[in-house]
UniProtKB/Swiss-Prot annotation:
Temperature dependence, free-text field: Optimum temperature is 40 degrees Celsius with monobutyl phthalate as substrate.
The species this protein was found in: Micrococcus sp
PTM text: Exists in two forms, E1 and E2. E2 is probably produced by modification of E1.
Protein name: Monoalkyl phthalate esterase
GO function terms (MF aspect): hydrolase activity
Entry keyword set: Hydrolase
Length: 20
């Protein structure tokens, strides 16, 4: 589902930003 893909992308992006 597009929603799941979007959520996963956002989660990965958040994690990446957290790592810096």
């Amino acid at each position: 589902s597009a929603t799941a893909a979007r959520e996963e992308y956002q989660r990965k992006r958040s994690q990446f930003i957290e790592i810096g």
